C-alpha cells in the first residue's frame, strides 16, 4: 500500500509540474509529428559536407546525430516515442555503463538474463527473454542460444555449454535503441517481446568542424575490480577519414554482498562466496572511409570483440548427489570460456537525390561468432589434499637416490633387535619419518618387472645400484634391505633403469599414489557464421499536401550454425615416482606404445576423442523486404505504416566423415530400425546410424512471415500528444528446436520440422504532456498476445530393441518432442517523465526530476505465470547540469517490489513432489540509491565518479533468483536449507570512477 501511495504521489507531482505551465509557456511553433517507429537499418550517418540540395529533414537528422555524440544531455526534453528508449554514447558515459546490464540499469520493464558463470544472456522484455528479444549490431542479428527445452534439460544444468547471447563493447557504441513490444519491422525474426539495437560509432560523430579527434579514457569499478582503458582516434585527410576505438578490460568475478566475509575454501552447492574468475575483454572498432565526391562514400569496417573468463567453478558439484547422501568434493572444475565476434563489412552510400531515393546504402557483412565453454576437472594440488599425488611419507630423490624428506636414508620399524645389521628384519609397512613418527601403510612395494627409474632423475651411471626390499616370503611386508644392480635400457630415445634381479621377493619402494593428477577436459563450441547483404533507401516527397518520409529496402543473408565438441584426458602435476615409461614387451623386447599396452595411463597415454556434436549443422537462408512510411496529414495528425516480408529456409548440412559426428546411441534405430540381430554388428550399426542421420538431414524447412506496424500520432494541442500502436512480430523456430535429437530410455527427444513460427501482437496507447521548456510526462497502457509458443511435451512411450545378438531385449523409451502449445497474454502500464525545474525559479536552473514506472501482469497457457516478467519497478531521478557543463550529478532511487509467489512457475514441481508450482527462492522488495557525478575542471578533461547501492542494502534481483536451478550440478544451492543462495546476491556498496582526456 505504501508503494502505491508513493507511486500516485510521484505521478501527481510530475503531472502538476508539467500540465500546470502548459498554457503559460506554449511555444509559438506548432507541434511536429515525427516518425515514431522507424526501421533502424537505414543509412543515418551522412557526411558533414552534405550537398546543398539535401532537404531540411535530412539536415536536421544529421544535426541531431552530431549533437547526440557531443553533449552531456542530448534530446532529454524531447517527448519519448511510444514504447521506445534511445540511449546515446553520452548518456551511457554519464551513467558509467560498463556492460549490457548497466545499459538498462535505470530503465523499467527491461532487464538482462543472468547465466551464472557465463555472465548475461540477452534481455527480458514484456514477459519473454533471450531469443524472443531481438538483438542486432549495425543491422546484423547476433548469435542465438540453443533454446530447445530438451537441450536445456539435458545439458544446461551442468555448465558444459556457453549457451548465451553475445554482448557488445559499450565504448564502441554510438547509440542503443530499445523497443518494447512486438516489432519485426526492424529486426525480422525474434522481435516478440522487443528488440535491442546497437549502432557503432563513426568518424563523422567526432569530426565536427575539425579534422582530428583524440581521446583516452581510464576507468575502474570496485564491484568486480575491473579496470579499463579506451583509446579513440579519428581523423580526416582530404577525401579519407578513419576511426579507431580500442578498449581493454581486466577484472574478476562480481563480488556478491558480504564477499570478503565468506569462506573461500568451501566447495560445492553450499558455497556462499562468488566463484573466482579472471575476466578479460578486448575490443577494436576500425572504420576507414573514402569520399570521392560529396555524394558518394565507401567504408571498410572491422568490429572485433573477445570476452574471456578463466577461473574455478567451486560451487559446481562434480558428484551428482541426492540430499542427505553427500560426500566431500575431491576434484574441482576449472573453466576457460570465451566469446569471440568478428564482423568485417563493406558499405557504399549515395546521397544524390533521384526519383527513387534521397539516400542509398548498400552493405555487405561477414560476421563470425564463437561461444566456447572449456572445462578441466582435476584436483588442485597445494590447495587441498589430492590422492593422485599423495606422499605423506615425504619421500624424495636426493643425489639420484630415494631418501626421507631431510635427505637421510629410509628407515622402517625393526622386527627383531639384533646388533648385526645384515640380520635385521624390518616391517616395511611401517615407515619412520624424520620426526620418529611411524607412518603406516603409505608406501607401495612393486615387482622389479613393473618398476622403471627415469635416468634423468635417478643415478644410472655404470655399476649403479639401488636399495630395495627383499621379503622373507613372496607375500607380506617383513624383510630386509638389499642393494641390487640396475640395468640400463633406452626406450624411444630416452634412458631408463630397471632392477636386474627378477626375484619375486624383491620389491621397489615408492609412494603408493600414482604420482600425477588425472585431468578430464572438454571443449564445446557453438559457432554462428553470417554473411549478409543489405540495401536501404530513403525518400522524402509530398503528395496532395501530405508529407511522406519513406524508407524501404531488403536483405539477403546466409547463416551457418554448428556445434563442435572435443574431449579427452591427460595428467598434470606429474611427480618423480610416476611411472615414466610404458616399458617393453617381455617376449619381443620392443617398447610398448599406447596402442600395444594393456595398461591405461593418463600421463603416458593422454586421450583426445574424435570431434562430435549433438546437433546437425544447419544453414539458414533469409530474404526480406520492408517498407516504412511516416506521412504527416496535418501538423496535428500523422501515421506510421510499416510492412515486412521474410522468407527463411533451413537446410541441414551433414557430410559423413567430415562433419563432427553425432554419437551413435542418440540416433541408432530412432526412425529406421536396426535389422534383426544386428545390434552387435558394428558395420550394421554404423550403416543404420548413417541412415537415420540422412533421414533427419533431408528434412528441409521453409517459413514465410508477414509483419506489420501501425502507429498514429495525434497532437490536439501544443502540449498534449496521443499515440496509438498496433504491431505484429514473429520468431521462427531455431534450428535446434526443430532438429535436436537425443535417444535414451529415460529421455528421448524427437525432431519436429512442422513447428509454426511464434507470433506476438502488441496494442499500446500512450498519453504525453510535453513542453519544450518544462519536459514531459508520458503514460502508456499496453497488451501483448503471444501464440504458438514452442514447448517440450511428453508424447508417448515406445519400445526399442536394445542389447546384442541373441539377447533380443526391448526397453520402453519415453518420447518427447517440441510442439506449438502455449498461448500467452501480458498487459501493463508504464510511466516515463522528466521535468526541468529552471522555469520554476532561477536558482533551480539546470535541475531536473525524472520518474519511471512499470507494472506488468501475464499468464500463458491459461493460468501459468510468465517467469520473465519483472516485479513492479520504479526509478526516481534528481539531476543537475551546470549551464556550461562544468559539473553535474544524478541521484537515482530504484525501488523494486517483491516477486509474488503466485507470479512464479516451477515446471518441475511434480517431479520434485512439491505441493504447488511456485518457485521457492524469490526476490524480496528492495530500494537502491545511486549517486553519479562528473566534473570538467578544464576543457579537455572530464572526471566521472559514482557510488552505487549507497546504503549498502543486501538484495537479490529476480533475474538472479530465477537463475537458480532446482537440479543439476551448476547454479544450484542447498534447496532444503538455502545455503549457497548468498552467492546470487548483488554487490553491496561499490564505486566507479573514470578519467577522460579529449583533444
Swiss-Prot record:
Sequence repeats: 26-29, 30-33, 34-37, 38-41, 42-45, 46-49, 50-53
Region (7 X 4 AA tandem repeats of Q-P-T-N): 26-53
Tagged with keyword Transport: yes
PROSITE patterns in alphabetical order: TONB_DEPENDENT_REC_2, TONB_DEPENDENT_REC_3
UniProt cross-references to SUPFAM superfamilies, sorted A to Z: Porins (SSF56935)
CDD domains membership: ligand_gated_channel
Domain of life of the native organism: Bacteria
A biological process term (GO) from this entry: siderophore transmembrane transport
GO molecular function: siderophore uptake transmembrane transporter activity
Subcellular location: Cell outer membrane
Motif TonB box positions after renumbering to this chain: 63-70
Domain TBDR plug, residue spans: 74-201
Motif TonB C-terminal box positions after renumbering to this chain: 982-999
Biased segments, Low complexity type: 26-55
Repeat listed as a keyword: yes
Signal peptide residue numbers: 1-24
Gene3D superfamilies for the chain: TonB-dependent receptor, beta-barrel domain, TonB-dependent receptor, plug domain
Lipid bilayer topology: Multi-pass membrane protein
Region span, Disordered: 26-56
Cellular compartments per GO CC: cell outer membrane
UniProtKB keywords: Cell outer membrane, Membrane, Receptor, Repeat, Signal, TonB box, Transmembrane, Transmembrane beta strand, Transport
Primary location class: membrane
Role: Acts as a receptor for hemoglobin or the hemoglobin/haptoglobin complex of the human host and is required for heme uptake.
Misc note: This protein is subject to phase-variable expression associated with alteration in the length of the CCAA repeat region. This mechanism is called slipped-strand mispairing. Addition or loss of CCAA repeat units would change the reading frame and result in introduction of stop codons downstream of the repeat region. This may be a mechanism of regulation and a way to avoid the immunological response of the host.
Family under the similarity heading: Belongs to the TonB-dependent receptor family. Hemoglobin/haptoglobin binding protein subfamily.
Protein name according to UniProt: Probable hemoglobin and hemoglobin-haptoglobin-binding protein 2
